[in-house]
C-alpha cells in the first residue's frame, strides 16, 4: 500500500516514476488561461488569512461545502473568515474521491509545509500555522507564482479593459510574463439587456463613434490592436450553445441597427449577429497570429434564486448537452475557406464531446503548424483524474497526444499551480502504463521528449510568447 501523497503519488509503474521525476517535475509552467487579477499580481497582494487566499471566489469549494450541508452564511455569507475555514475543514474529509481532497493537501504541503490532513479536529492548529506563514515575507501573489516556477501567465480580459496592470508589470520588469487574454463575450451577447450600454463603453474605449455595425467591427479591431500592442496572443470565447447561421454583413447591419434602436430580435437574428461577428474576430486573430480558444457547452446560472442573490460564477453552473458538431464544423470551415482559421483550441464541458472535438480538430489540421487544431485539456467539471485521463486517452486514440499543449489552471486562486503537478503525474502514469503493458516501447529518449513537450515545450512553441519580447523591444527602438 502506498502512503498518501508520497513522491510516487498517481505514479503506478517504475516507468511513470522515471518519466515524472526525470522529465516533467521541474519544468516551468505556462499557464495560458486563468482568471487571476493582474492588479493583484502587480500589487503583490498579500492575504490576511488562509480563507482569503483559499475560499474567496473558489466555486469548486463552495459547491462541495453546500453539498456537505454548510449554510450559505459560511460559504459566501457574513460568517467570519475563521468560521468559514472551520466549515471548509469540516467538509474536506467528505471530499474523498473528489480532486479537491488532493488539491487541498497538495497546496498545504507545497506552499505551507503542512503535512497533516485537514479536518475539523486540527483545523485551529492549521489555521494558526498557515496564517503565520502568510504574514511572512514571500507569501504574496507574485511569490506564489514564482515559487511555482511559472514562466508565463495569461489572464482573461474584456476588450474594454485598460490593461494598465499588464503594462506596469512589463515596465517594472517582473520576471514572469503576465499577458492579457482577449475575451469578447459581451460584444457577441446581443441578447443581453446591457448590450447597448456595452456598445457605448466599447466606443469610449476605442475612441470610435459607433453608429453602425461597421463602426462596431472597427471598434473591436481597434481593441484587438490595442491588446496586441500589450502582448496579447490569445483570445477566448465562452460559447454556451454552439450555433451558426449563414448571413451577410448587410443583413447584420440591419440587425445591429434594430437592436440599438430598442427593438427585440428574433432568435435567428441573434444567431446571425453572433455568426458574422465571430467570423470577423476569427479573421482578425488569424491576421495577428493569435490562438483562439473556444469553451463550449456550459449551462450557466441554473439556480435563479441564487443567481439573483449572488450573481454569476458562484457555483451554480453545470454541463450543457447541446449538439456541437455541425455548427462548430461550419464555423471552422467558413474560416478555413477564407484562409482565416487561426490556431484553435477546442474545449467542451461535456465529455461526451471528446470524440467529436478530436475528430473535428483532425479535419482542419493544415500540414504546417504541428498541432494547429488542439483538443483542449479537460476543463472545469472534467478537471479530475477521470476527466483528464479520458481526454488524453481520446486524444491519443484519434490524434497526436505528442503535440498536445497540456494543462492550464483556469483558476482565480494563486495556490492552484499544483494542478499542473497533478496533470503531469497523470500524464506520466498513462504513458508508463502503456510501457508496462508492452503497448509502446521503453524508449526513454522518445517518451521523455514527449512528456517534456506536453508539460511545457509544446505550449511554448504553439503560442510563441517570445514574440512579445521582440514586439516590445521594437516599440522601444521606435
UniProtKB/Swiss-Prot annotation:
EC class (word): isomerase
User: What is catalysed by this protein?
Assistant: D-glucuronate = D-fructuronate; aldehydo-D-galacturonate = keto-D-tagaturonate
Q: In which pathway does it act?
A: Carbohydrate metabolism; pentose and glucuronate interconversion
EC identifiers of the protein: 5.3.1.12
InterPro entries linked to this entry: Metal_Hydrolase, Uronate_isomerase
Q: Does the keyword Isomerase apply?
A: yes
What Gene Ontology molecular function terms does this protein carry?
Answer: glucuronate isomerase activity
Q: Which UniProt keywords apply?
A: Isomerase
Task: Show the Gene3D superfamilies listed in the entry.
Answer: Metal-dependent hydrolases (3.20.20.140), uronate isomerase, domain 2, chain A (1.10.2020.10)
GO BP field:
D-galacturonate catabolic process; D-glucuronate catabolic process
Q: Which superkingdom?
A: Bacteria
Question: Which residues are in coiled coils?
Answer: none
Family, as annotated? Belongs to the metallo-dependent hydrolases superfamily. Uronate isomerase family.
Matching NCBIfam families, A to Z? PRK02925.1
State the HAMAP family in the record. UxaC
Name of this chain's protein: Uronate isomerase
Q: Which organism is it from?
A: Bacillus pumilus (strain SAFR-032)
